[in-house]
Amino acid sequence: MPKHSKRYLEARKLVDRTKYYDLDEAIELVKKTATAKFDETIELHIQTGIDYRKPEQHIRGTIVLPHGTGKEVKVLVFAKGEKAKEALEAGADYVGAEDLVEKIEKEGFLDFDVAIATPDMMRIIGRLGKILGPRGLMPSPKSGTVTQEVAEAVKEFKKGRIEVRTDKTGNIHIPVGKRSFDNEKLKENIIAAIKQIMQMKPAGVKGQFIKKVVLASTMGPGIKLNLQSLLKE
């Protein structure tokens, strides 16, 4: 069993572990239990009813949070010529082609949160799969990161579009803001995230798709949400 800090144990006392909280109350509580000295990220942990053994039930896509995550997103773009210029003008942090592939391969450069590529770049970045894939950074048409519309993609990811995927236990983890966000912004982000995840339900999923939703800060305890009231929001 991991040993928890005194701060965490004190925060856990504030949470009734048998209770399923309404969203407004959960947001108040998650802020109270976020007592670290930095501006903690507020995260949504969603347990789904997918069968992870079936690849067609894996979820991977993007959602848009109306107020972003509160984190400055570094965007890298693999593109050449006019598309490279468009990406830079849209605010991309790094733009290049073979030079960036080499930097990632030889120098282990990974100082970015999202990688976008034009379709013609896939032949040269394919070999980065082993490096970028496990980190969730490999451009993919499914997640909207392989596109000709690089300027639009850069702007959207900078504004608050984030990639989501199920992990090996069928759970989805989504940053929905910071402790410093006001309650209404957190609420709007959470509701937007849940609604968009509901739309990603794979056709083959039997029974309940979203089984449990937990709200937590980076260093704080989990707060279970009342699913019935949440899905009515």
From Swiss-Prot:
GO terms, molecular function: rRNA binding; structural constituent of ribosome; tRNA binding
Entries under PROSITE patterns matching the protein: RIBOSOMAL_L1
Alphabetized UniProt keyword annotations: Repressor, Ribonucleoprotein, Ribosomal protein, RNA-binding, rRNA-binding, Translation regulation, tRNA-binding
Single biological process term from Gene Ontology: translation
This protein's record includes keyword tRNA-binding: yes
Cited function: Binds directly to 23S rRNA. The L1 stalk is quite mobile in the ribosome, and is involved in E site tRNA release. Protein L1 is also a translational repressor protein, it controls the translation of the L11 operon by binding to its mRNA.
Assembly with partners or alone: Part of the 50S ribosomal subunit.
PANTHER family: 54S RIBOSOMAL PROTEIN L1, MITOCHONDRIAL, LARGE RIBOSOMAL SUBUNIT PROTEIN UL1M
Protein name (record): Large ribosomal subunit protein uL1
Species: Thermotoga maritima (strain ATCC 43589 / DSM 3109 / JCM 10099 / NBRC 100826 / MSB8)
Lineage: Bacteria, Thermotogati, Thermotogota, Thermotogae, Thermotogales
